């Protein structure tokens, strides 16, 4: 197993993706609307990027600014469309009104990902109780944080 850090770059479209790969990116995180901390790209965008580059892609599943799941059925539809467009890895994370993991939403969305790897995205940064979140998500292989090391939060035990 390589100890080399993975360079992940945000891509909003095909041009970004091609430039990132040419610049040495190992992996892309595909999003739209960075002003909202990244939302789901369209299935057409994912398919276009998948055709244009040959590095790993992680695709955002989030429909609105903030970390509330919102319309879970729509999230499930979008996740399925992204999967059909060639997405094989995902980032997602939903909190309820109290700032705790919205497990029902997470489980519904993950249920349509056909076993694809996924990362609990930056919702942890806004969680009311990070220790409780970690326990709720026991077994999740990866968390993505903004500005804080995972070891500082004792995410992994």
Task: Annotate each PLM feature.
Residues 1-4, 49-67, 115-116:
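N-terminal small/glycine-rich loop or linker at the start of catalytic domains
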Residues 5-11, 28-30, 57-63, 90-92, ...:
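Hydrophobic faces of well-ordered beta-strands that scaffold small-molecule active sites
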Residues 6-19, 23-24, 29-30, 37-38:
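N-terminal beta1-alpha1 ligand-phosphate binding loop
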Residues 12-23, 59, 63-84, 125-141, ...:
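Catalytic cores of alpha/beta
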Residues 15, 34-55, 69-76, 94-114, ...:
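Active-site-adjacent beta->alpha loops and helix N-cap segments on the catalytic face
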Residues 20, 49, 82, 109, ...:
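Conserved, mostly hydrophobic/aromatic
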Residues 21-28, 53-56, 86-89, 112-116, ...:
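Glycine-enriched alpha-helix->loop->beta-strand junction motifs that scaffold or abut catalytic
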